């Protein structure tokens, strides 16, 4: 039997500031509804999701403010770079996320945009709560101390 052409997960965009600015409670993998030129542009790797967030509009969840630049080889049928994009979830997942956002004051933050093994664009969405300034400082102190410990152990060993 012929061997399958296996693809690894390819992370295209990552929101690195999210783990510093938010206390992440839960993560979920969601699909994203895209046009053809958007998929091609994402594959080029110029996408940014750092300033983006997800919001409930009606009974659907949308990705707001994600920047997927226009595909350079496309002609007049190109897409709008910062348009809202629909996220694809099951109804129970949507209800759970909407409930957490409305009742508990949580926020939906995208962490990663990637292509899975089947070549589909997926988004790792986090249910998070914003950190206060003193929490951010504490996180930074812990990170600095762990780096310093590593340096001390390496210099001794």
Swiss-Prot record:
Superkingdom as given in the UniProt entry: Bacteria
Query: Which residue intervals make up region (Disordered)?
Result: 132-157
| Any one Pfam family match given in the protein's UniProt record, by short name | SmpB
Name the major location.
cytoplasm
Q: Where in the cell is it found?
A: Cytoplasm
Entry keyword Cytoplasm:
yes
Q: Where is the composition biased (Basic and acidic residues)?
A: 135-151
UniProt GO MF annotations: RNA binding
Some GO term, biological process aspect, for this entry: which one? trans-translation
The record's InterPro entries line, in alphabetical order, gives: SmpB (IPR023620), SsrA-bd_prot (IPR000037)
Q: Which UniProt keywords apply?
A: Cytoplasm, RNA-binding
Gene Ontology terms: cellular component: cytosol
Give the protein's biological function: Required for rescue of stalled ribosomes mediated by trans-translation. Binds to transfer-messenger RNA (tmRNA), required for stable association of tmRNA with ribosomes. tmRNA and SmpB together mimic tRNA shape, replacing the anticodon stem-loop with SmpB. tmRNA is encoded by the ssrA gene; the 2 termini fold to resemble tRNA(Ala) and it encodes a 'tag peptide', a short internal open reading frame. During trans-translation Ala-aminoacylated tmRNA acts like a tRNA, entering the A-site of stalled ribosomes, displacing the stalled mRNA.
Return the similarity comment.
Answer: Belongs to the SmpB family.
The cross-references to HAMAP family, in alphabetical order and at most eight, read: SmpB
This one is known as SsrA-binding protein
* Lineage per the UniProt record: Bacteria, Pseudomonadati, Pseudomonadota, Alphaproteobacteria, Hyphomicrobiales
């Amino acid at each position: 039997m012929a061997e399958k052409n296996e693809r690894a997960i390819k992370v295209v965009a990552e929101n690195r500031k999210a783990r510093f600015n938010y206390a992440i409670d839960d993560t979920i993998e969601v699909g994203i509804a895209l046009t053809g030129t958007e998929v091609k542009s994402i594959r080029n790797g110029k996408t940014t999701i750092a300033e983006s967030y997800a919001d409930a509009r009606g009974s659907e969840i949308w990705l707001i403010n994600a920047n997927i630049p226009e595909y350079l080889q496309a002609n007049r049928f190109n897409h709008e770079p910062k348009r809202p994009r629909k996220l694809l979830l099951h109804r129970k997942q949507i209800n759970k996320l909407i409930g957490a956002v409305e009742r508990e004051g949580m926020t939906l933050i995208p962490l990663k945009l990637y292509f899975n093994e089947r070549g589909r664009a997926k988004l790792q969405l986090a249910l998070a709560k914003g950190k206060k300034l003193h929490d951010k400082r504490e996180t930074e102190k812990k990170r600095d101390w762990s780096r310093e410990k590593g340096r001390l152990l390496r210099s001794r060993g």
